[in-house]
Amino acid sequence: IYDRLVGSEMCIRDRVLVERRFQVGDWIYVEGVIEGTVESIGFRSTVVRRFDKSLATIPNFQFAENAVINNTQTTNRRINWMIGLEYRTTSEQLKNIKKEIEDYIKKSDDFVKSEDTLLSVKIDQFAASSIDIRLICFTKTKHFQEWLNVKDTLALEIKNIVEKNKASFAFPSTSVYVEKNS
């Protein structure tokens, strides 16, 4: 029994190592299991440093049985935002806001511009409290802190564009109508 157990443990470890799904230093995510930076890959388990700086020891079978997202190997980072504008925003304002956001992204050196990389600034839906514009674009950087900086700059630019067009962001609200009884 011991030989079979050791053999299966080695098989799982070898699968983790041979498939090269990740290596020491990689930022990985396994849904419902772990997210963090790989510190070591051992015989039976892998040690991952979580983003709260705690260490987690994960049995290797978890990596063999689950999808592993290796964020270190990403080529770009995606921004996928829903921008909610008030219902009083006119069609003309919506067109201008969408165009100016798209123009900003196309002119900025921070974003990927290629035929095979999606850039979309489109009205997505008429939500309960807003007209929603979905923005999807990809940054050139894959580094987390740089990505946060690009998002911050983009958010401020979008706010400027919305204000310049004399529109406002929506917030969840409820309208109450009271009927008069005659």
Language model segments and positions:
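Structured, soluble regulatory/oligomerization domains located on the cytosolic or IMS-facing side
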Residues: 30-32, 37, 41-182
